């Protein structure tokens, strides 16, 4: 894993093992995704397995600061003046924000890594049109409301529907056999 060794020079120098962080774990998973050229469909399936549970935990464990981050991302997502890159960044921030609100270090690391891969594979102006933006904004607001209300069941159910619908719509819009994250053809 990256970032686990700290090399110090000098008289008291040497190689020192550092405690792994969420960031180092996310970097390792991200390197695996890029290095193994994991297919976007595999990332989406993993996302469908993890994100509903993140939303459930977020509803149980969220803080006011977590809600403020989700609200900030929701505002950016709903901005009609946002270009594709701004929208995708806000979308990524919201999804990572849900995992952060779960307060589960492993889920946070996985979601950071998955979100970066999904972002790279879905940067497609033909797919992310105004209708997709509106549906995304509505879904995020509904999930955030369930998290705010500490309704874990509703948060998980809404997130499951959201990520599944997004995966289905993406698959319909792109009929290539596979999109490989890390492929120069998909904006790496």
Q: What is each of the regions a protein language model found here?
A:
Residues 36-37, 123-126:
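Short alpha-helical transmembrane interface motifs in multi-pass membrane proteins
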């Amino acid at each position: 894993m990256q970032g686990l060794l700290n090399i110090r020079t000098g008289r008291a120098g040497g190689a020192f093992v550092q405690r792994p962080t969420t960031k180092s774990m996310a970097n390792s998973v991200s390197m695996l995704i890029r290095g193994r050229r994991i297919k976007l469909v595999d990332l989406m399936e993993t996302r469908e397995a993890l994100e509903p549970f993140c939303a459930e935990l977020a509803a149980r464990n969220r803080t006011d600061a977590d809600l403020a981050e989700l609200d900030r991302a929701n505002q950016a997502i709903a901005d009609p003046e946002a270009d594709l890159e701004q929208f995708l960044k806000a979308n990524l921030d919201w999804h990572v924000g849900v995992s952060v609100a779960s307060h589960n270090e492993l889920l946070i690391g996985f979601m950071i890594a998955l979100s970066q891969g999904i972002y790279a594979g879905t940067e497609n102006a033909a797919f992310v049109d105004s209708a997709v933006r509106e549906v995304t904004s509505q879904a995020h607001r509904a999930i955030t409301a369930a998290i705010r209300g500490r309704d874990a069941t509703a948060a998980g159910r809404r997130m499951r529907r959201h990520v599944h619908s997004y995966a289905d719509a993406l698959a319909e819009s792109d009929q290539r056999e596979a999109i490989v994250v890390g492929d120069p053809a998909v904006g790496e």
